[in-house]
Amino acid sequence: MVARRQTKKARKPAARRRSAAKRAAPAAKKAASRRRPKSAKKAKPAARRRSSVKPKAAKAAAQVRRRSRRIRRASVSK
């Protein structure tokens, strides 16, 4: 039997993530579909809507949200 040569695409980490998501639980599959794809063409509509937000910007926004929530909670508990 001839071993099937792995294509270049299959070696890429994104491909590995995708195939891992296929094997994983439905929740992980959902996360994979939410992930910002490298090409907008392959993106699911929801991911395409999000793709305008760069990951770093999204992370910063999340930090700000967390911070303001903490401040609000602290002022209430006083």
From Swiss-Prot:
Q: Name one GO cellular component term.
A: nucleus
List where Basic residues composition bias occurs. Answer: 1-21, 31-57, 64-78
Compartments in which it is found: Nucleus; Chromosome
Q: Which GO terms describe its biological process?
A: cell differentiation; spermatogenesis
Among its keywords, does the record have Acetylation? Answer: no
What keywords does the record list, in alphabetical order?
A: Chromosome, Developmental protein, Differentiation, DNA-binding, Nucleosome core, Nucleus, Spermatogenesis
Q: Which GO terms describe its molecular function?
A: DNA binding
| Membrane spanning stretches | none
The parts of the chain that form a coiled coil are none
Primary subcellular site in the record, as a coarse category: nucleus
List the residue ranges of the region (Disordered). 1-78
Q: What role is this protein assigned?
A: Involved in nuclear basic protein transition: histones are replaced by spermatid specific proteins which are themselves replaced by protamines in late spermatids.
Task: Return the protein name.
Answer: Sperm-specific protein Phi-0
